[in-house]
Design a protein with these regions (language model features):
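Alpha-glucan (starch/glycogen) binding determinants
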Residues: 1-35, 74, 97-100
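An acidic-aromatic substrate-binding cleft motif
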Residues: 38-55, 60
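Short, acidic/polar
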Residues: 64-72
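Conserved, mostly hydrophobic/aromatic
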Residues: 75, 85, 193
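Short, solvent-exposed turn/loop segments enriched in Gly/Ser/Thr/Pro and often Arg
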Residues: 84-94
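Aromatic- and acidic-residue-enriched segments that line the glycan-binding/catalytic groove
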Residues: 93-123, 185, 194-201, 205-211
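Conserved phosphoryl-transfer catalytic core
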Residues: 121-148, 155, 159
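Conserved small/polar residues in nucleotide/adenosyl-binding loops
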Residues: 221-222
């Protein structure tokens, strides 16, 4: 740009656009699928694996974000450049195994709670409850195949207990405030939908007796 010269030119024939007869306020957009430059195509070795398959001794019956971090560290140590995973967005509709299809998400922003690394969320002070989850962890990890419903039920039980223990502190923290302000545009509707979905026992908002038509001020009364 500073030298006012082109670094490279496309190799394909020139594009032609017939003189269109556009009406006032009309816009014509021509989109080409490819651009043709003599630029070497980047190549890199990598691995394709779904996060739920990364189960380790630290997991709770399913691979989680902690396991993904360990996978990334391994990929770096073996000089791999790419890790391809399946979608990890929240697909929760009925809390049943039918929610396990990764391509049927309810949000393009929210991650599936199942992938949360429990060990990174804090330790339960209730020793009896902590012992119960340690036992459940071994049971879930020992299964020959992932039990979607059992995993999610266990993790949600932990989420509620750790929120009861640490929730007030987290909600009052500056870090949460920054996260909330940066993401509230999608976070609030997602939270309200999730609450109403469970309250009315269906993800089909058309069947809800109330709030079936989106109204932010009214709907947000359900937020804490």
């Amino acid at each position: 740009k500073e030298e006012k010269k082109a670094d490279c030119w496309e190799n394909n024939p020139n594009r032609y656009l017939a003189d269109p007869e556009l009406k006032t306020n009309e816009t014509l957009v021509i989109s080409d699928r490819y651009a043709y430059f003599d630029i070497p195509v980047w190549k890199g070795a990598g691995i394709a694996i779904p996060v739920f398959s990364l189960k380790s001794e630290n997991s709770f019956g399913v691979g989680d974000f902690g396991d993904l971090k360990r996978m990334i560290d391994w990929a770096v140590s073996t000089q791999q450049k790419v890790i391809q995973i399946l979608p990890i967005n929240d697909t929760t509709m009925t809390h049943a195994w039918t929610d396990s299809y990764p391509y049927n998400s309810i949000s393009i922003y929210a991650f599936h709670p199942m992938y949360a690394d429990i060990k990174q969320m804090g330790t339960l002070k209730d020793k009896s409850a902590a012992a119960k989850f340690n036992k459940k962890q071994k049971e879930l990890n020992g299964l020959p195949a992932m039990d979607y419903e059992a995993v999610n039920q266990t993790k949600w039980e932990y989420f509620r207990l750790i929120f009861k223990q640490e929730g007030e502190k987290v909600l009052a923290s500056g870090e949460f405030g920054e996260f909330f302000n940066a993401n509230k545009e999608w976070l609030q509707p997602y939270a309200v939908f999730s609450y109403l979905r469970d309250a009315f026992q269906t993800p089909n908002f058309r069947e809800w007796p109330r709030h079936s038509v989106y109204n932010a001020p009214v709907s947000y009364t359900h937020l804490r």
